[in-house]
């Protein structure tokens, strides 16, 4: 993995996006970075290790090429503005989800279920009355 400066990272990230524009994906991770290069021991803590300031570790990969950068808290605002502009420019290939079809399908299914419940309740209500009020009710009772 290549550790780059923030400006070089943004340039390489743009290249990754351009390379994967037609097919492929770019995976980006962001996490807090305390400056350690070795893992934390299981038993006990390392004494005397105090991180100077908060840092973020950004990693990006397309599956083959990996790049990373560390952004300190002092330059995070500048980096965030450049990073957000880069994401807006290169995430235009995303597909929008069609939410209207889902709501139409669920409304149609709910309407059909309500009609079935109403149809099942109508003959039962007509059977409980002594004299049918409409010809449709007589047909419903005759069908039973």
Swiss-Prot record:
The biological processes this protein is annotated with in GO are: SRP-dependent cotranslational protein targeting to membrane
Q: Among its keywords, does the record have Transport?
A: no
Q: Spell out the InterPro entries in the cross-references.
A: Signal_recog_particle_SRP14, Signal_recog_particle_SRP9/14
Keywords on record? Cytoplasm, Phosphoprotein, Ribonucleoprotein, RNA-binding, Signal recognition particle
Keyword Metal-binding included in the entry's annotation: no
One of the Pfam families matching this protein, by short name:
SRP14
What Gene3D superfamilies does the record tag this protein with?
Signal recognition particle alu RNA binding heterodimer, srp9/1
Q: Which residues carry this modification: Phosphotyrosine?
A: 27
Question: What is the purpose of this protein?
Answer: Component of the signal recognition particle (SRP) complex, a ribonucleoprotein complex that mediates the cotranslational targeting of secretory and membrane proteins to the endoplasmic reticulum (ER). SRP9 together with SRP14 and the Alu portion of the SRP RNA, constitutes the elongation arrest domain of SRP. The complex of SRP9 and SRP14 is required for SRP RNA binding.
Quaternary context? Heterodimer with SRP9; binds RNA as heterodimer. Component of a signal recognition particle (SRP) complex that consists of a 7SL RNA molecule of 300 nucleotides and six protein subunits: SRP72, SRP68, SRP54, SRP19, SRP14 and SRP9.
Q: What is this protein called?
A: Signal recognition particle 14 kDa protein
Which species is listed as the source? Macaca fascicularis
Where is the organism placed in the taxonomic lineage, from the top? Eukaryota, Metazoa, Chordata, Craniata, Vertebrata
This protein's gene is called SRP14
């Amino acid at each position: 993995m290549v550790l780059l400066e923030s400006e070089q990272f943004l340039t390489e990230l743009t290249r990754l996006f351009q390379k994967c524009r037609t097919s492929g994906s770019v995976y980006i991770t962001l996490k807090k970075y305390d400056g350690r290069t070795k893992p934390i021991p299981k038993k006990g803590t390392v004494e005397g290790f105090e991180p100077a300031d908060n840092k973020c570790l950004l990693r990006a990969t397309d599956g083959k090429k990996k790049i990373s950068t560390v952004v300190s808290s002092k330059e995070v605002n500048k980096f965030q503005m450049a990073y957000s502009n880069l994401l807006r420019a290169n995430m235009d290939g995303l597909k929008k989800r069609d939410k209207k079809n889902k709501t139409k399908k669920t409304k149609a299914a709910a309407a059909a279920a309500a009609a079935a419940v109403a149809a099942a309740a109508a003959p039962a209500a007509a059977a409980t009355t002594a004299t049918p009020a409409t010809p449709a009710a007589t047909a419903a009772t005759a069908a039973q």
